[in-house]
Amino acid sequence: HRFDTADKAKGNRNGWYVCPSLEVAVYGFWHLGIQENVTTGGNADPAAAAEARLAAQRAREQREAELRAQQAKTAEQARRWWTAAGAADPGHPYLTKKRLAPHSLRQRDSMLLVPLFYDGELVNLERIFPDGAKRPLFGGRAKGVAGLVGKLAGAERVLIAEGWATAAALHEAMGLPAVVARNADNLEAVARRLRQRLPDDVAITLAADDDRFTDGNP
């Protein structure tokens, strides 16, 4: 069974619980990595504890299967949208406000589309609206995905930025390929994957946003 947690938006369904018997209940929160067991016999009941571990394992396996299915569905949607979209309008309000060229962006209605890749496959899209709001497609892979402004082939140095606009501005100013990690939480995962892919003599520089004093940032 799944339920919403109070610290996330409505519909998040990050909480879960299973009751394999009248003597055992297991609950947890996926986004926090928390899992707790409750047994009528207390922790000293080995049979109940074993039952709780098995129930938790089954819950994890079910959750992982659901995630894979949803991510595959979102990836298919991303590919359909990307294929059907046209080149981004250089006069799009977001681009004119940022004074940036569209580069490889595409556009669907009023939304700019930033392609996000994982292991070379298009798995998600970040939508940028005219007012600057940014939203990925629902249910898509998030950790380790990245976009790109410029080309990696032949590069001696590669930059990793958080947002697309920062990456595009760096590319235009420095002529270097700039990878889009989307947010600070994804910088490390993207950097590690990029390091594995690129030759050892290619330098990688993190160009993180200087917003450490913003409320809620680490």
Regions from the PLM with identified roles:
Residues 73, 111-200:
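Phosphate-handling DNA/RNA-contact segment within nucleic-acid enzymes
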Residues 30-32, 117, 128, 209:
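Structured loops at beta-to-helix junctions and adjacent beta-edge loops in soluble globular domains
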Residues 1-93, 211-213:
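Non-catalytic accessory segments of DNA primases and related replication-initiation nucleases
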Residues 201-214:
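Acidic beta-strand-to-loop metal/phosphate-binding motif
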Residues 189-193, 213-218:
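Active-site-proximal loop/helix of nucleotide/amide-processing enzymes and allied scaffolds
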Residues 108, 181, 207-209:
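Conserved beta-strand termini and adjacent loop/short-helix elements that scaffold enzyme active sites
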Residues 57, 61-149:
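Conserved phosphate/metal-binding and DNA-contacting active-site motifs used
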